[in-house]
């Protein structure tokens, strides 16, 4: 785990970064992408009060929303890091969205997507490349991450 400005960056995950939108991805088996928002994303959003997640069976395209978040200061998409079909969504974060602020890499997972294009996994960032890009966002946004209790 790398920590930069109090922002946690797990080294064992993949990342989809589109501007300031930062999403983490964990591959389960060979074709399931577990998706969530990063520590940076939850800090920039502030206290998340609502999340809408695409339902099971819905097809999503890479870069298009798999969910939408609302906080007191921000509303916007959680982009799908890969194309595929939503096979599960986290009903716990829909009931209690603040879980995303408290545990973005654990209980705060958002959706599971059955990957339809394996080539897109190769386009995700990982390792030092991901860490460097996330550190650049932390610096440019002057972020110091904090978790809500």
From Swiss-Prot:
GO cellular component: cytoplasm; glycine cleavage complex
InterPro entries per the UniProt record, alphabetical: 2-oxoA_DH_lipoyl-BS, Biotin_lipoyl, GCV_H, GCV_H/Fam206, Single_hybrid_motif
Gene Ontology biological-process entries: glycine decarboxylation via glycine cleavage system
Lipoyl-binding domain mapped to chain residues: 32-114
Cofactor remark from the record: Binds 1 lipoyl cofactor covalently.
Cross-referenced Gene3D superfamilies: 2.40.50.100
Function description: The glycine cleavage system catalyzes the degradation of glycine. The H protein shuttles the methylamine group of glycine from the P protein to the T protein.
Family in the record: Belongs to the GcvH family.
Modified residue annotations for N6-lipoyllysine: 73
Keyword entries, A-Z: Lipoyl
Presence of the UniProt keyword Isomerase in the record: no
Cofactor: (R)-lipoate
Source species: Sulfolobus acidocaldarius (strain ATCC 33909 / DSM 639 / JCM 8929 / NBRC 15157 / NCIMB 11770)
Protein name as annotated: Probable glycine cleavage system H protein 2
